């Protein structure tokens, strides 16, 4: 009996040609695994294609709700970003995929896990560190670090040679990653920084100048930091993301053209569509500004940056990530309420916040007198607060 390899399978260019390559070079029984995180593919077609390409078996794991509840809700609560811009759509999906690959490898008693990540990218790190953290005995096969194929053009030529159909041409050669949270576009003419990216590549977002000519008002209700209602309607987690993707997309919201510093050293350019995430982060940030005290709010910004870097670097299965999640959950205890947004041609304007946990007090914050605060109190505070500056000035006077 042949030994088994579990392949992270998408049906795209790289994983389509890996099946015949594995059989040709390793003589392994290939078990394909497609983890459905909302990439929008025809899963019946993916199943058929995997078998036609030479896989002995194909698993399609629908984990969309798990992806939202156990991963994206953590993104929203933490407002995690990498380098202040990237909303980590790929990064949050990879640990869940790694988890499912290991589960199926155990079920199939497979000694190997294979992925189609490029040797220059971050995903190879995320997959392999994720696998090692769960089962250090599983061996990894990474074709892009081994085979003679050096470019996506070479990969297309190899696909034609072995008779594997691929949904990519040499004319339009973007590498696309899609899930519930985002769509990313890399490669092709994007690699020349002098090129403006082409708006016809968008999957989810209408270009802002072509978006609706009238504003859209949107209400999002959060409960302990997680979104549960849209415009007053309770929705399940997956439907919330889908609905916000639609609303944000038709209003031209959620496009980012980013130059990022990859974990492996080089810079890369990506075009990201994240309409739901952009709306949720904007609303969540507004609600936190009202419900968190000053020091928690400011410290959480530091933690959010660290959290984003951890997730980006593939360190999901770590004690630090779990500890940060525990801290974030504590901060979210009173992050409950409704935020109203006004959307227009790529812009988001927060309109109002309605929450019983507001730390904002109109009476204290107004310019008039208050039982808790007198204008006269400011004089003593200023004298003490400014004392170090005054002493230094006196010494140097």
From Swiss-Prot:
Subcellular location: Cytoplasm
Coiled-coil segments on the chain, per record: none
Pfam families assigned: Arginosuc_syn_C, Arginosuc_synth
GO biological process: argininosuccinate metabolic process; L-arginine biosynthetic process; urea cycle
Keywords: Amino-acid biosynthesis, Arginine biosynthesis, ATP-binding, Cytoplasm, Ligase, Nucleotide-binding
Top-level taxonomic group: Bacteria
Cellular component annotations (GO), alphabetically ordered: cytoplasm
Its EC number(s): 6.3.4.5
Catalytic activity: L-citrulline + L-aspartate + ATP = 2-(N(omega)-L-arginino)succinate + AMP + diphosphate + H(+)
Gene3D superfamilies: Argininosuccinate synthetase, chain A, domain 2 (3.90.1260.10), HUPs (3.40.50.620), Single helix bin (1.20.5.470)
Pathway the protein acts in: Amino-acid biosynthesis; L-arginine biosynthesis; L-arginine from L-ornithine and carbamoyl phosphate: step 2/3
Molecular-function GO term, any one: argininosuccinate synthase activity
Binding site for L-aspartate: 118, 122-123
Ligand binding (L-citrulline): 86, 91, 122, 126, 175, 184, 260, 272
Key word Cytoplasm present: yes
Listed PROSITE patterns: ARGININOSUCCIN_SYN_1, ARGININOSUCCIN_SYN_2
Binding site for ATP: 8-16, 116
PANTHER family per record: ARGININOSUCCINATE SYNTHASE
Family membership: Belongs to the argininosuccinate synthase family. Type 1 subfamily.
Subunit structure: Homotetramer.
Protein name, per record: Argininosuccinate synthase
Species for this entry: Clostridium botulinum (strain Okra / Type B1)
The organism's taxonomic lineage, starting at the top: Bacteria, Bacillati, Bacillota, Clostridia, Eubacteriales
């Amino acid at each position: 009996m042949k030994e088994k390899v579990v392949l992270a399978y998408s049906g795209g260019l790289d994983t389509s040609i890996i099946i015949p390559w594995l059989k040709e070079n390793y003589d392994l029984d290939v078990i394909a695994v497609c983890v459905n995180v909302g990439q929008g593919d025809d899963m019946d077609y993916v199943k058929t294609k995997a078998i036609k390409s030479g896989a002995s078996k194909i698993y399609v794991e629908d984990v969309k709700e798990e992806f939202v509840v156990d991963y994206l809700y953590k993104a929203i609560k933490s407002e995690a970003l990498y380098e202040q811009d990237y909303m980590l759509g790929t990064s949050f999906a990879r640990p869940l995929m790694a988890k499912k690959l290991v589960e199926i490898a155990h079920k199939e008693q497979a000694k190997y896990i294979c992925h189609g990540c490029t040797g220059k990218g971050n995903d190879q790190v995320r997959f392999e560190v994720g696998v090692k953290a769960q089962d250090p005995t599983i061996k990894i096969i990474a074709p892009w670090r081994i085979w003679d194929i050096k470019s996506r053009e070479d990969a297309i030529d190899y696909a034609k040679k072995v008779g594997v159909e691929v949904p990519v041409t040499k004319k339009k050669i973007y590498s696309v990653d899609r899930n519930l949270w985002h769509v990313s576009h890399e490669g092709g003419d994007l690699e020349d920084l002098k090129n403006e990216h082409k708006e016809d590549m968008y999957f989810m977002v209408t270009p802002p100048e072509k978006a609706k000519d009238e504003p859209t008002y949107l209400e999002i209700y959060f409960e302990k930091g997680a979104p549960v209602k849209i415009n007053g309607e309770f929705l399940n987690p997956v439907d919330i993301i889908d609905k916000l993707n639609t609303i944000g997309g038709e209003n031209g919201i959620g496009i980012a053209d980013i130059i990022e510093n990859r974990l492996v050293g080089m810079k890369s350019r990506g075009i990201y569509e994240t309409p739901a995430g952009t709306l949720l982060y904007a609303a969540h940030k507004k609600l936190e500004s009202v419900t968190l005290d000053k020091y928690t709010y400011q410290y959480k910004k530091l933690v959010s940056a660290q959290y984003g870097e951890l997730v980006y670097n593939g360190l999901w299965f770590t004690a630090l990530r779990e500890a940060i999640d525990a801290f974030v959950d504590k901060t979210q205890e009173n992050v409950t309420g409704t935020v109203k947004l006004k959307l227009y041609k790529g812009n988001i304007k927060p309109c109002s916040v309605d929450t019983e946990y507001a730390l904002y007090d109109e009476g204290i914050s107004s310019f008039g007198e208050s039982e808790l605060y007198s204008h006269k109190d400011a004089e003593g505070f200023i004298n003490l607060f400014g004392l170090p500056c005054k002493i230094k000035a006196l010494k140097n006077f």
